[in-house]
């Protein structure tokens, strides 16, 4: 089979995205035009702006710093200039073919700089005839379609597990008499405190900082990649997390506002950011696991956010909102522990299934890469 070698820049002439950058980040699902990034997030939201909309489709958007790519066949605007819009020379390549080919390029992007013009566009690739490209794309699409069906099934199972978790939590707390509900502040050893704000210039080294993307469903994300921030000794003392603390997301969209986590272990002095709130419970009055399970229920989170202040893109809660949240508190600590243990047994089963699903997701990603590598073997 005959191949012709080209630099990527010959196949993918670029355009700067400046003319298509969104003016406002007041996004809404009710608006028409997606705002894109080339990274994993892809669609950041939708805008109602009507000018500067890119419509010369299809194209590939290229993250100039990470080299991530996305194939786009719908009208869009962009968030920033940190990307290149890559047009496709269809005299030489089929759009999907060159997009798939980009996915198997090995490239070191560890240095924080722009890559397309100086280096990435100069990478050479061997390209077959258009007919052969079409055959390869058809085969990849066929295999990916089967893989996508399996991934859809995994996603459905994940959703069902989330529903089951909430059902377990709801059942555990449903029979507690209403007279046992008290404001959370009555069992606090240390009242809620907002975290620390530091500008970007302080980030890069120093102490780990827990941010709002670092905890979900009552737990700090396993293997969470902490950012680091330079701090004074008094800042570390004031904002340090301690084992047994509970953190709450105090500023976010309504779908994430009020999510909590129990701090179970710390490898080194760690602080929490300004969009996070921290409080400490009195273990003589309330079992920490019991409290965390309750706050992880839909109705427990509702208590935390019922007086939230809403703006266009985000909402917030304050220390008073958290302190006044009602929580059922049986006087007997042993009764609380029994409830927590029963929940834990059911949740452990869910977690095992969840881990299996995550492994299957990773295998699907590996299979996708394997399909691409085999497709482009010359």
Give residue spans per PLM region.
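Ligand-binding loop in jelly-roll beta-barrel domains
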Residues: 91-92, 281-287
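Short coil/turn segments at secondary-structure boundaries
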Residues: 21-27, 112-116, 181, 197-205, ...
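A short glycine-rich beta-alpha junction/loop motif
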Residues: 77-84, 110-131, 198, 268-277, ...
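Non-catalytic DNA-recognition/assembly elements of restriction-modification systems
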Residues: 1-19, 26-41, 126-137, 145-146, ...
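Short, ligand-facing micro-motifs at secondary-structure edges
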Residues: 18-23, 42-78, 92-100, 105-113, ...
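Interdomain signal-transducing alpha-helices
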Residues: 98, 133-136, 291, 339
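Sequence-specific dsDNA recognition surfaces
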Residues: 5-57, 74, 78-81, 185-200, ...
């Amino acid at each position: 089979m005959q191949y012709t070698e080209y630099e990527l820049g010959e196949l993918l002439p670029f355009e700067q995205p400046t003319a298509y950058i969104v003016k406002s980040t007041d996004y809404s699902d009710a608006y028409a035009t997606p705002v894109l990034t080339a990274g994993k997030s892809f669609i950041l939201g939708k805008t109602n702006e009507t000018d500067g909309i890119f419509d010369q489709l299809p194209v590939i958007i290229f993250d100039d710093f990470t080299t991530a790519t996305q194939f786009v066949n719908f009208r869009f605007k962009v968030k920033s200039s940190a990307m290149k819009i890559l047009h496709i020379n269809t005299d030489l390549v089929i759009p999907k073919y060159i997009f798939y080919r980009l996915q198997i390029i090995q490239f070191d992007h560890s240095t924080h700089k722009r890559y397309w013009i100086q280096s990435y566009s100069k990478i050479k690739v061997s390209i077959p005839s258009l007919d052969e490209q079409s055959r390869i794309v058809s085969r990849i699409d066929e295999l990916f379609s089967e893989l996508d069906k399996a991934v859809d099934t995994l996603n459905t199972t994940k959703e069902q597990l989330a529903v089951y978790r909430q059902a377990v939590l709801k059942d555990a707390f449903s029979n507690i008499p209403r007279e046992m509900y008290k404001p959370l502040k009555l069992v606090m050893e240390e009242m809620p405190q907002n975290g620390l704000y530091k500008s970007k210039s302080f980030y890069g080294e120093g102490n780990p900082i827990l941010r709002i993307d670092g905890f979900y469903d009552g737990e700090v994300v396993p293997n969470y990649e902490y950012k680091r921030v330079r701090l004074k000794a008094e800042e570390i003392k004031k904002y340090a997390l301690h084992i047994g603390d509970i953190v709450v997301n105090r500023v976010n969209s309504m779908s994430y506002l009020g999510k909590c986590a129990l701090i179970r272990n710390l490898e080194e002095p760690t602080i929490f950011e300004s969009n996070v709130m921290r409080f400490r419970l009195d273990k003589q009055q309330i079992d920490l696991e019991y409290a965390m399970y309750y706050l992880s229920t839909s109705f427990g989170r509702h208590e935390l956010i019922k007086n939230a202040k809403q703006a266009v893109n985000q909402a917030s809660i304050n220390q008073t909102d958290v302190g006044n949240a009602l929580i059922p508190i049986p006087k007997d600590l042993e009764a609380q522990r029994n409830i927590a243990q029963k929940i834990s047994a059911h949740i452990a089963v869910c977690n095992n299934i969840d881990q299996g699903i995550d492994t299957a997701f990773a295998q699907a990603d590996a299979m996708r890469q394997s399909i691409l590598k085999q497709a482009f073997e010359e």
